[in-house]
Amino acid sequence: MMEQKTVHIGNMPIANDKPFTLFAGMNVLESRDLAMQICEHYVKVTEKLGIPYVFKASFDKANRSSVHSYRGPGMEEGLKIFQELKDTFGVKIITDIHTEAQAQPVADVVDVIQLPAFLARQTDLVEAMAKTGAVINVKKPQFMSPDQVGNIVDKFAECGNENIILCERGSCMGYDNLVVDMLGFGVMKKSSNGSPIIFDVTHALQMRDPSGAASGGRREQTVELAKAGIATGIAGLFLEAHPNPDQARCDGPSALPLDKLEPFLKQMKALDDLIKGFEHIEIK
């Protein structure tokens, strides 16, 4: 049986054979007050259910389809909001960066920095992120096979950072559609020598509208897709929720309604406990 690596976010262990961690929040920081509201709800629910939790939001959505789409408050204001969330709720935070210059300032505030899928092969950005010593979450590009993610892990290791989490978010299946290959989770574990794998169920539900500038989505299928991912035995779920998804400023069609969070997580925890309670069967 392949040994599973453990990455620590502070004193929080992240591994494929440990109880799942929730990396979740909102897509983009829309306002300080909304971030506080959403984070508080996540903290209350995860504490009640005993689920390890890391708050997620972006300060800049630098890869929006349209130049007219909302991008966020920017790094300076975003980091102020993140610091207030940490001070208020004692929560760990994950956010994404897009340039080398953002790496150290962001790593000084948050606990995990994320390498976006579209930038996952950019060596200069990888080097800058690695040098911070922070835990890194790598989004697997939609165009990359599960076998190839091991190359990204190796690149970070060559740059001196082995604190790597890998995130599945679906693969391109023809034009404007994403499909999650459930066999890919096991392949990613093997190709990365047991690195923690988390599943971004929210962005896996995106479906492009070829006639429009915004992404559509299939949030009504969140539960079934998340269950399928959890059943493969992974380290965590990556999720976005919103009090009113139809009014969200980014990716609302894929976001979970915030009032569904507790029943959703109850089912995910029950399934995760069941799956990880089974004896491992090794087939060669």
Curated annotation (Swiss-Prot):
Catalytic reaction equation(s): D-arabinose 5-phosphate + phosphoenolpyruvate + H2O = 3-deoxy-alpha-D-manno-2-octulosonate-8-phosphate + phosphate
Its EC number(s): 2.5.1.55
GO biological process: keto-3-deoxy-D-manno-octulosonic acid biosynthetic process
Superkingdom of origin organism: Bacteria
One Pfam family here: DAHP_synth_1
UniProt keyword annotation of Chloroplast present: no
Entry GO terms, CC: cytoplasm
InterPro entries assigned: Aldolase_TIM (IPR013785), DAHP1/KDSA (IPR006218), KDO8P_synthase (IPR006269)
Subcellular location: Cytoplasm
Keyword set includes Transferase: yes
Top EC class, one word: transferase
GO MF annotation list: 3-deoxy-8-phosphooctulonate synthase activity
SUPFAM superfamilies reported for this sequence: Aldolase (SSF51569)
Main localization category: cytoplasm
Alphabetically ordered keywords of this record: Cytoplasm, Lipopolysaccharide biosynthesis, Transferase
Pathway listed: Carbohydrate biosynthesis; 3-deoxy-D-manno-octulosonate biosynthesis; 3-deoxy-D-manno-octulosonate from D-ribulose 5-phosphate: step 2/3; Bacterial outer membrane biogenesis; lipopolysaccharide biosynthesis
Record family assignment: Belongs to the KdsA family.
Protein's name in the database: 2-dehydro-3-deoxyphosphooctonate aldolase
Organism: Vibrio atlanticus (strain LGP32)
Organism ancestry: Bacteria, Pseudomonadati, Pseudomonadota, Gammaproteobacteria, Vibrionales
GN (gene name): kdsA
